[in-house]
Amino acid sequence: MINQATGSPGQLGVDDGDDWMSGDQVEYNGGFWPISKGGLDDLTYGESVEQGLDRLGQRIAAENPDETIVVVGYSQSAVILSKYKAETTRGNIVYVLVSNPARPNGGILSRFRGFTIPVLDIPLSGPAPTTSPGWEAGEDPTTFDVAQQYDGWADFPLYPLNVLATANAVLGIVYLHGNYESIVDPDTALAPGAAVTDSRTHGDTVYYTVGTDLLPLLRPLEQIGVPKPLLVALDAPLRVLVEQGYDRTLSPGESASARVLRIANPVTDLTNFVHAIPVGIDNGLEAAGYDRVLGTARAGMYGVGGPQPTPPSADAGENLARSEAPQAKTPERRNTTRSPIRGPVKVNRSFAKSLPKPGAPATSTPQPRTGLLKRLVAAAHRDTGADTTAGEPKPKAPSAGKHRKRVEN
């Protein structure tokens, strides 16, 4: 599996008890020169991605192509998995992508595709594919993509000239991007029927966009002590303005580059903003412990006038768990002659049982809470004979680099 990118060597890694990204790892540099943890000694972003891609290719090429491999990538590592998926001809792989900058609609590498930032060596490589080798339309998903609303690496505005939306996404990188395992509670955010999550399927990929309760724009005010009810009241009208930087009717799997002009009805925009003011007042009163005196209803995660999210359903991945993944049709493409990676890759056929698809009613049976990655990965190792301690899974499967710092991309 692969973890998030910069600040420390990268990992393609697996949950192993308390350290949510420990376990058998495919190590790579994870650099974002010159601002990552190794500073001037780190690889550039582009070099780091290529290194991780080569090493992942070596590891997977050494495995039995008839067995299913589960790989997880967080941030830069999700980019590596996206590139690998685009290049490989091997099937039998389940991908879990967390905060993926290559998310087709929202990922910053997709918004500004086709360019390379010179000196820093950051190729804006474009969207992750939404098909897999051997996969055909109508078959069960092979890929699960999780992103927080307003995380600027994975949910960047479609209309970046909306200054509020862009500033909000940049602050989302600061306040959201490095904290998925502590902010996103899978027992609620990914639970069937979860109102806080928008779940959509495009091609072979199920996308989960987890709603953010407070705009990142307001987080600095929260840090300096502005009362939370006041911030909650401000969120509703501000969210209407921020959401004008997006088009939430597009699927996260629909490739969408940044656009200059937004064509919209200004009367509708103004009406939504005005309606959001009393909603915000009621939200603030409710946050302070009072009734909603103006009688308004709470808006969804996309704000007043925004589309309603499609919550996850109870049957996510059940067919995938019951069936074999598609067989590889030809050998893996990548060069496998470079340095070996330590440790075996585990295989699994029941990973997706815990991941909901769009559409069914909620279940009332709570699951023990672990971190986001713990919960996503644990099911991937249930059938691998992994040891357990104190009820926590101790799996051992593929990963990419050493996880020490969780904030940078």
Where do the protein language model's features map onto the residues?
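Composition-driven, intrinsically disordered low-complexity tracts enriched in small residues
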Residues: M1-Y74, K83-N409
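Catalytic nucleophile loop
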Residues: S77-A78
